[in-house]
Amino acid sequence: KGVLDRAEFEARNDQFFADYKAGTLNIDEFLDFQLRPLRDNKRTQLAIWHNQFMAEVIRPNMKPSAIELVKHHQADNAVCVIITATNSFITQPIAQAFGIEALIATEPELVNGEYTGKVTGVPSFREGKVTRLNDWLAAKNWTLSSFESSHFYSDSINDLPLLECVSHPVAANPDHKLAEIAQTRGWPVLELFK
């Protein structure tokens, strides 16, 4: 939309993604980069752009296999939660599109109704996902052991701390490092996007 220098943005984003896949992402540097456009634009404009993003990019790429997986868990009366390092501005509408009410995401700070470019609370990344999940469960007077089983699907080695906490870890479209761990530990591997 001409708000960012496309070449610079893509180069930095590609480097952050490579670091993420390698398990070496500096979350603070990434969040400073990721949240800057929220800080630099009014929420009304951001909402317009996000609606376009949902219509043009997200909804056309929502794979039936992923939608069916969510529906399967919901049919079993599972409490479905999306837990993501991506900020809630981006992910809340995506969670809603999948019919999932509960979202644990990195929370961008709001002051006087506008984004500051900073984070509120613990980023939902690596061990932070475990912390944020435990806080969310505690607010409902639950723990993971309150449930007969717990499932977590991930594509990233960065999610190993949470995968190790649940009764049913699943590597979904895993990166190379996670695929190796899943094979070693006998975890199921799903290819949801083929």
Annotate each predicted stretch with a short phrase.
Residues 48-51, 55-194:
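C-terminal cap/substrate-recognition subdomain and adjoining C-terminal extension
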Residues 1-72:
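A metal-dependent, Asp-based hydrolase signature
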